[in-house]
Design a protein with these regions (language model features):
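Acidic donor-binding loop of glycosyltransferase active sites
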Residues: 292-304, 317
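Nucleotide-activated donor-binding/catalytic signature segment of Leloir-type glycosyltransferases, i.e.
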Residues: 264-285
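A charged, aromatic-enriched C-terminal amphipathic alpha-helix characteristic of glycosyltransferases
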Residues: 343, 356-386
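Conserved donor-binding/catalytic core segment of Leloir-type glycosyltransferases
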Residues: 207, 213-237, 243-249, 255
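Conserved acidic donor-binding segment of nucleotide-sugar-dependent glycosyltransferases
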Residues: 333-334, 338-345, 352-359
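Membrane-proximal helix-turn-helix segments that form the acceptor-binding/catalytic region
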Residues: 143-181, 189
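Short hydrophobic beta-strand element within catalytic cores of glycosyltransferases
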Residues: 299, 318-322, 331
Length: 392
């Protein structure tokens, strides 16, 4: 995905629709800048004027576009320390959400674990980004595994250990108050089925794809031909494996966009194997140049929703991706990219070699990216809400 990029498709991307009366929105907490918050903004554009109920609202920590939304935080929002770090609020959020009742014909809840528990007088549609990670993937969510450090991680670990059993009961009950479940990917569809026993429709979110028609600025020191890897430098992103894999391929360089705690280790590895440039954080203009000039993208991490291949596809570039997770939804093998079966150096190298040898149709790849547009997301969302309004 774009690093430090805030560009996204906006309401200008689809025709203005007449407002639907009786619709309210909900989101877990409006305190950060993430994919779930982008979805909440898309929902707000789809249902202009609808109030957005949430546990916590921290304007300085989230997208500025929320200033134009009727955000209605709960009383727990009075505690500034919780607004600034919603994870510390974990022990208190179930009670806060349970106390909130929304008068609406349809409540559309954007949820990763809390908003689906808000009660309503009408129908409830839940858009699930993932079942509550702090309950079902606690180590990954908060870094609470062996060796984790820091007050926040320890606090969240204590909270999940102490409150986890009761929160799981609450979460299960909350999930089954929904009249309809939507999910962002087939991966989450399976998780919702396994955890809740609920059948959900897959409605991919509108990705914050970098516009391909903006300004461009070249990146110094980049040799061509090259493949691109766009990722936060974290262990589970498997960037080290990508470095070693591309280093095996003659006459091909690798450019890595992104930053993170693994940077120093990856710089040492890149220096040792050669043919690798760690570009760090780049501007939108530089990222456009990189996508436009790359042979393709390499994506080797497990993701619930595989965004970066769609960003590459907007520039007509194919992707070599791990055959797992969200990439199963966002890469069309043979048309927009190739898969490798395991995050292993040999597998990645073979896939990248296949990508460089194949002939790709730029127009087909771009057309694939267009199927994930905000216009399509909004149209289906409005159709679903209209159906639920008729049930009310």
């Amino acid at each position: 995905m774009a690093v430090d990029a805030t560009s996204a498709h906006t309401a200008d991307a689809f025709p203005e629709e007449s407002p639907l009366e009786g619709v309210a929105l909900a989101h877990d907490y409006v305190t950060q800048r993430g994919g779930a918050e982008r979805v909440a903004l898309s929902m707000s554009r789809a249902f202009a004027g609808a109030p957005l109920y949430t546990t916590l609202y921290h304007p300085e920590g989230t997208f500025p576009e929320f200033a134009d939304v009727d955000v209605r935080p709960m009383p727990i929002n009075r505690w500034g320390v919780l607004r600034r770090n919603h994870r510390l609020a974990l022990p208190f959020l179930a009670n806060a959400v349970s106390a909130q009742h929304v008068e609406a014909d349809v409540l559309l809840a954007s949820s990763s674990g809390w908003a689906h528990g808000i009660s309503t007088s009408g129908r409830k549609v839940v858009y699930c980004h993932a079942p509550a990670r702090w309950l079902y993937q606690a180590d990954r969510y908060a870094g609470t595994g062996a060796g984790s450090r820091g007050l926040r991680s320890r606090a969240v670990k204590v909270a999940t250990d102490v409150f986890g059993p009761s929160l799981r009961v609450w979460d299960q009950k909350a999930a089954h108050t929904a009249d309809r479940y939507l999910v962002n990917s087939t991966v989450i569809q399976r998780a919702v089925s396994q955890i809740y026993g609920i059948d959900a429709e897959v409605l991919p979110p509108p990705p914050a794809v970098l516009s391909s028609d903006g300004d461009v600025r070249s990146v110094d020191g980049v040799a061509r031909p090259f493949v691109l890897c766009v990722a936060r430098l974290l262990p589970y992103k498997n960037v080290d494996l990508v470095i070693e894999a591309v280093a095996r391929i003659p006459d091909l360089d690798l450019v890595i966009v992104g930053d993170g705690p693994e940077r120093r280790r990856l710089e040492a590895l890149a220096h040792r194997v050669g043919s690798t440039t760690l570009a760090g954080r780049v501007t939108d203009e530089e990222l456009r140049w990189l996508y436009a000039n790359a042979v393709g993208l390499v994506a080797a991490s497990y993701e619930d929703f595989g965004l970066s291949p769609l960003e590459a596809a907007a520039f007509g570039r194919p992707t070599a991706a791990l055959r797992d997770g969200g990439y199963l939804d966002t890469v069309d093998p043979g048309r927009t990219g190739v898969f490798f079966d395991a995050p292993a150096v040999d597998d990645i190298a073979c896939a990248v070699e296949e990508l460089t040898r194949a002939e790709w149709r730029d127009d087909d790849i771009r057309a694939h990216a267009d199927t994930f547009s905000e216009a399509r997301f909004v149209a289906r969302l409005r159709q679903i809400v209209e159906e639920e309004l008729h049930h009310h």
